[in-house]
Amino acid sequence: DDCVCPGGREWASVASKADSQEARVNRLAGRVEALAENLRAGGDRLSHYKSEFRELEFRVDELEGNGCEPRHFQCGGSAMECISDLLTCDGSPDCANGADEDSDVCHIPPIAGTLLVGHLNTDHDFCTKRKPNEFDLFISSVQRSSYFQSRLKVKGNLQIKYTAEGRDQEDVLQVKGYYNFGTHQLVILPPEDDRLGIVCNFRAGNDDRCRAHIVHEASLEHCGDDFVFVKEDDHH
């Protein structure tokens, strides 16, 4: 009875979801190809097309993967090539097409002075002690080591807003972490003894927001729902 067999109700549901996913990938792939043609043609809107092209490529990779193992960078181009993310933006091209040293890959989204604001759903938070409803992450320092250029050392302050005993509360924690050029990830290391950190995934071509989640340090298992950090332009 538990078999998902052709012709059965469960099979129809699975097949429908698979068809829907394939259709989404095909639509995105079509848009990527159209933008690639615009990039080849050049024109006044080249930078706009390039940014949108990278955004769409990222979305396709999210749906079907990019063919690389975890902690690897997809070089792109006509031939499949993957390199360790430790080799990205280290000052020496390792991809055959030099993509790992491209300025779009190696630019820095979380510059010093950046404020990222995220709103969290407390209903599914079963592991934090405060059950925060808002994170305000202020990046105070970004440093790049000459001997380890593929990572940026990041320091900042995390303002945690939550409700306790019927009142709005705020705590501020000093935090540190790193930015990984190869994966476009900002990682905030656990600031407290609960060993919960934050991982935030930027999309190539979009520095204004990143998809974030609280994670257990040991397992990287997500704690509660994902949320979105949005860059605040004016936080004076």
From Swiss-Prot:
| Every LDL-receptor class A domain range | 66-108
Keyword Disulfide bond listed? The answer is yes
- For this entry, the protein name equals Giant extracellular hemoglobin linker 2 chain
Q: Which molecular-function annotations from GO does this UniProt entry contain?
A: oxygen carrier activity
Pfam hit, one: Eryth_link_C
State the UniProt keywords alphabetically.
Disulfide bond, Oxygen transport, Transport
Species whose genome carries this gene: Tylorrhynchus heterochetus (Japanese palolo worm)
Q: What does this protein do?
A: Acts as a linker for the assembly of heme-containing chains in the construction of giant hemoglobin.
Q: List the disulfide bonds.
A: 68-82, 75-95, 89-106
Its quaternary organisation is:
Disulfide-linked dimer of identical chains. A model is proposed for the subunit structure of the Tylorrhynchus hemoglobin, consisting of 216 polypeptides chains, 192 heme-containing chains, and 24 linker chains.
